[in-house]
Amino acid sequence: MWDLIASVVCVGLLTGLGEEMFFRGALQRICCDGMRRRHLAVWTAAFVFSTLHFQFFGFVPRLVLGAFFGYAYLWSGSLWVPVIGHALNNSAVVAFMWMGNNSIDAAAMGEAGSQSAVVAIVSAVVTVAMMVAYKKILANGKKTH
């Protein structure tokens, strides 16, 4: 159990914090200032984020995840939003890997992904809808203040 806690702290929390400070807090901000095109800055930082993970088959999902974190930062104005999202994502991966390595209901975990294409599409649509709704809520909040 202590190995899980140590992994969540190192891989989940510290890596999420460090990567977001670099990719969104520094790189995306520099790109925004230099390019003056916020969407291009988000996607440039996401591209570099995905490329520097050096995983060919995970490039596109990581690119989308990087863009998600980039827009979360852009729209919220707070680096803590993508830091928390990144830390939660990394911590979930660590926890699932730990459960798989410790044979904790591995059969049920395998069945959970049997509809992965449908689940991935539905998840992507719901995520985009939530991001658009979040942006609208932020825009409405700024108009009333």
Where on the chain are the PLM-derived regions?
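Membrane-embedded alpha-helical segments of multi-pass membrane proteins
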Residues: 9, 60-67, 88, 92, ...
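C-terminal membrane module of polytopic membrane proteins
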Residues: 87-145
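Membrane-interface helix/loop boundary segments of multi-pass membrane proteins
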Residues: 18-44, 71-78
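Active-site-flanking alpha-helical
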Residues: 22-31, 60, 84-85, 92-93
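Juxtamembrane helix-loop-helix connectors linking adjacent transmembrane helices
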Residues: 1-15, 29, 33
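Hydrophobic residues within alpha-helical transmembrane segments
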Residues: 44-48, 64, 84, 88
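Small-polar-interrupted transmembrane alpha-helices in polytopic inner-membrane proteins
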Residues: 11, 38-53
